[in-house]
């Protein structure tokens, strides 16, 4: 018993990032030497399932509790966060257009993929987003509809603030703390979940599947890395007037790494909230901005939609004009907001963007098929970019306000 306690203590004392890296290595080795050990992959499924299960409850109780206590301060910082989320998503789409023009890619179209219902136009995507605001609150919690969860949590919190007894508000605050503790327990087991996810990917997908579509994959990943390491840091520098890379690399390490394997911004919400707490951000702000970011901060999705659409146009010999490219950027940025919370969700919006150039749904669905083939890497990098950006710009808005108030930036940004 003492030995077990000692092992658990040593496990908890070890850096979470180091534990995740060890889990990554162990999962890779097990996939190579024992590809038939399906139980290892189940660890990944359980981890992602736990995160997806607790995330909607976490968002609801934290937002409702903050508003009920009367402490939620959705001031200029919140407007700054929304502006940064939307700006970077549009810039990501615009940069994807530029890189596609610089390095035009044609692909050998695969068979059309069978998928969920495809949005037929931008209006349908926006209509769905608005409808999600007033979706049944129980249904929103069950389905991970974070727009609906935020709306009803705000309504519930405001109502509770006006009519709730103090004891009820304390209970709500205690509930929020209890759910946050459960999240910390789940995140503490992340190395086992990452091990299972890596095992599933390595044992089920060989590198040979990427050979045929290597150029397309390289363009997608290269554009996402350019966005993550050049464009986003530059925007952060404009607001903070200091070296942004300590914050960038911390977000990529603690948020992006986990998101790379979960492949879901929604599932990574608890991880991001934990990171925001470490960054000393205002809980009243990040409890709203992080779930919102998981819905509207979709840099990677905008890049995927844009590049895949232009690859289809190149393959068919369609000449894309500059005005059409600008419209595509806007359509991809807005449409990407409908891809949140779904692994590979951005691929389902390719037909919508393809319709701008008169590309048939059959051809567009073949591009979706190509996307699923390279999705092991593309979707992982896309989600890492999206999720890390959620924290980066929530922190940027917060720290920008600190500078306005004469408050010093955190020590790690002063180095």
Enumerate the language-model features and the residues they cover.
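Juxtamembrane helix-boundary/capping and inter-helix hinge elements in multi-pass membrane proteins
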Residues: 67-76, 162-166, 205, 241-244, ...
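Transmembrane helix boundary and interhelical junction motifs in multipass membrane proteins
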Residues: 58, 193, 264-272, 302-308, ...
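Helix-loop-helix junctions within the multi-pass membrane cores of secondary transporters/permeases
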Residues: 254-336, 393-394, 407-414
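Hydrophobic transmembrane alpha-helical segments of multi-pass transport and channel proteins
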Residues: 50, 86-90, 94, 221-225, ...
């Amino acid at each position: 018993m003492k030995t077990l306690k000692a092992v658990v203590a040593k496990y908890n004392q070890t850096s979470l990032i180091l534990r995740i890296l060890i889990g990554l290595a162990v999962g890779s080795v097990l996939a190579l030497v024992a590809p038939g050990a399906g139980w290892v992959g189940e660890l990944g499924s359980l981890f992602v399932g736990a995160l997806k299960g607790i995330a909607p409850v976490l968002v609801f109780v934290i937002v409702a509790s903050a508003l009920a206590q009367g402490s939620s301060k959705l001031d200029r910082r919140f407007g700054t966060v929304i502006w940064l989320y939307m700006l970077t998503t549009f810039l990501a789409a615009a940069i994807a257009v530029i890189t596609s023009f610089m390095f035009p890619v044609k692909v050998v179209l695969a068979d059309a993929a069978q998928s969920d219902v495809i949005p037929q136009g931008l209006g349908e995507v926006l209509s769905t987003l608005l409808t999600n605001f007033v979706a049944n609150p129980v249904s929103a919690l069950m389905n991970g509809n974070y727009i609906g969860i935020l709306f009803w949590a705000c309504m519930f919190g405001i109502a509770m603030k006006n009519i709730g007894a103090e004891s009820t508000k304390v209970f709500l605050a205690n509930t929020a703390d209890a759910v946050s503790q459960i999240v910390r327990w789940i995140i503490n087991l992340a190395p086992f979940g990452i091990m299972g996810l890596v095992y599933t990917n390595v044992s089920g997908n060989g590198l040979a599947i990427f050979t045929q579509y290597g150029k397309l994959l390289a363009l997608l990943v290269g554009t996402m890395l350019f966005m993550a390491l050049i464009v986003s840091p530059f925007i952060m520098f404009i607001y903070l007037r200091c070296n942004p890379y300590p914050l960038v690399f911390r977000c990529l390490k603690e948020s992006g790494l986990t998101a790379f394997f979960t492949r879901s911004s929604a599932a990574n919400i608890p991880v991001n909230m934990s990171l925001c707490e470490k960054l000393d951000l205002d809980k009243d702000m990040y409890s709203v901005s992080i779930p919102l970011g998981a819905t509207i901060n979709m840099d990677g999705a905008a890049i995927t939609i844009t590049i895949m659409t232009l690859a289809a146009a190149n393959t068919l010999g369609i000449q894309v004009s500059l005005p059409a490219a600008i419209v595509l950027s806007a359509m991809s940025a807005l449409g990407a907001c409908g891809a949140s919370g779904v692994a590979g969700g951005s691929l389902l919006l390719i037909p919508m963007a393809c319709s701008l150039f008169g590309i048939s749904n059959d051809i567009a669905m073949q591009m979706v098929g190509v996307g699923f083939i390279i999705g092991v890497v593309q979707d992982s990098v896309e989600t890492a970019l999206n999720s890390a950006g959620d924290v980066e710009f929530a922190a940027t808005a917060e720290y920008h306000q600190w500078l306005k108030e004469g408050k010093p930036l955190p020590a790690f940004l002063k180095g």
